[in-house]
Design a protein with these regions (language model features):
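Acidic, PIN/NYN-like endoribonuclease modules and their adjacent C-terminal/linker elements
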Residues: 1, 107-139
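Short, well-structured N-terminal submotif of metal-dependent ribonuclease cores
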Residues: 1-37, 46-61, 129
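A generic structural signal for short hydrophobic patches within well-formed alpha-helices
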Residues: 9-10, 42, 74, 125
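Histidine- and aromatic-rich ligand-binding microenvironments
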Residues: 4-5, 37-38, 99-100, 121, ...
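Short, hinge-like loop/turn segments at secondary-structure boundaries
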Residues: 52-56, 84-86, 134-138
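Active-site neighborhoods of divalent-metal-dependent phosphate/nucleic-acid chemistry enzymes
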Residues: 65-116, 120-122
Length: 139
């Protein structure tokens, strides 16, 4: 089971400049097993692209399934965001930096409930979710 991140789905559904690479990566992943979206990704894609039912139908048409975030993943996300805030403070950076809870929920879901994550945000997920297989669409 491989999870897919919002940025890649926006490329696919919005026909963005990375759409071809994202499509090739998704096809490869689907060839080896299920590809899933978690609650956060479904919410973010809906917010970015339109009506929920239409978005979920489009995801279903692409062969993606829904995988809700489990309690253990939610707890891990909170722990990782706490580390992020502590690192930012220690480095003298503003705590209100771009990383919000949704990023940590997506990462924890992929780490604990899946076998990898398709994303364009390689650095963040490798840094905070050690052991997570990060799959980046090649452009």
């Amino acid at each position: 089971v491989i999870a897919i991140d919002t940025s890649v789905l926006i490329d696919l559904l919005g026909d963005g400049e990375g759409a071809d690479a994202a499509e090739a990566c998704l096809r490869l992943a689907l060839g080896s097993g299920p590809v899933v979206v978690c609650d956060v990704v479904a919410s973010e894609v809906t917010a970015g692209l339109g009506h929920g039912a239409e978005v979920m139908d489009a995801l279903d048409d692409m062969g993606l399934t829904f995988s809700p975030i489990e309690q253990r993943s939610a707890v891990r996300a909170g722990e990782m965001q706490r580390k992020y805030v502590q690192r930012a403070r220690a480095a003298g950076q503003p705590v209100g930096t771009p990383r919000t809870m949704p990023d940590f929920l997506v990462g924890a879901h992929a780490l604990l409930q899946c076998n990898g994550l398709i994303t364009r945000d390689e650095g963040f997920f490798r840094d905070y979710f050690k052991g997570l297989k990060v799959i980046v669409p090649k452009t």
